[in-house]
Amino acid sequence: MFLIKKISIDKIYLLGILLLGLISGFTFNLIFFTVPYQLSEARYTTDIIGLISLAAFPYCLKVVWSPFIDKYSIPFLCSKFGARRGWAIASQLCLILAMTGFLSFSPCDNIYITATILFIISFCAATQDIVLDAYRIERPTSKKELSLAFTFGSIGFRLGMLLGSVGALYISVIFDWSTVYKLAICITFLGPMIVLCIKEPKPKQKSHRTKDLINLKQYFEVIKSSIISLKNEQQHLLLIMLFVFLYKAADSIPMAMSSPLLLDLSFTTHEIAFIYKAYGLFIMIVGGALGGILSTKIGILRSVLTGGIIQLLSPLMFMILAIVGYNVKIFIITITTQNFCIGFAGTIISIYFANLCNSEFIATQYSIIASFSSVSRIVLAALGGICAKYLPWSLFFFCNTLFSMLFILVFFKVYGKKI
């Protein structure tokens, strides 16, 4: 009721953000789940499927081309619809064209063509996400509204993930895989229509855009200006980066190591698919909604601290599951805890990232912070894998909990006087 009430008071654009988030989440799972699953059905080996996932690398490198989105104006589209909406429409139209590649071609037919199409889809989808992130920061007119914008975007993204995984599987069983890709194109086609229905945001600072392609000097100048502006606004920038790294530990390590643990404990594929994927995503949506609401009630800093502390329950529950062994009830409690924490803390940390950005180059700033967060997730997952090889599961997740608690020390070092 709280969210519905907020929409009704001249905030209808939040519904647009939710729907655009749904498209983004659906595309994300198309790349990371749907196509790999179809390849698994076709008996492709795990090493091939693993290499295919590299086609999604543009998601980790958004910062590389975000300066172009901040500085360059696409002829006609940006002058007609505004900078953010123009870029959004361009990226969505390119995304639709890329997806049509799977209409006359099955991903199982040629692995090299599949990788190429997925890479193009990833690039277009990542570009769309850069623009939407900037829109969610620039469009709101208050801190509370900013929290709502990221909450609605997060809920939409999770719904899209649910539709792109469980929904895609059901459609493939009832019809076929080609119908799944037709549905994907239809859903993505809604993107430009939604963008046309929402207003162009007012930049937080004066923007100096150009219709000429920026040169290498201008490109690095945008990145340099973004970092300098970020450093000027945030005196303890290095400590903030360390805080983000430690904050992700309670989320990234259990997420990366949960599948090996569950298989070691002899949970079935059906149990993992239904409880971990379908039910887990639903709980994630609930957690994300509550996280967004909390940030509007008690402020972003207190919400970040609360989310981080609650997040510590995730590795603790996996430790208990490792001690107990195969137990469906404990498994459900563990997955409920983990996914609630991911949704709850994930939404709050996204709002926190948005609050750090305040310059002419918002898309670049947010991409820098989000890219660091993504790299942190990858590094933590890799370190977790190495440690898990030498430690029993219960001790591993206990150490994970202790390590994750270090974020509290860094948080109070940076924000102790502001709480």
From Swiss-Prot:
It is found in: Cell inner membrane. GO terms for molecular function: transmembrane transporter activity. The keyword Hydrolase does not apply. It is a multi-pass membrane protein. GO terms for cellular component: plasma membrane. The chain crosses the membrane at residues 12-32, 48-68, 86-106, 111-131, 155-175, 178-198, 237-257, 274-294, 304-324, 330-350, 368-388, 392-412. It holds the Pfam family MFS_1. Keywords: Cell inner membrane, Cell membrane, Membrane, Transmembrane, Transmembrane helix, Transport. It comes from the Bacteria. Belongs to the major facilitator superfamily. This is Putative transporter AmpG 3. The gene is ampG3.
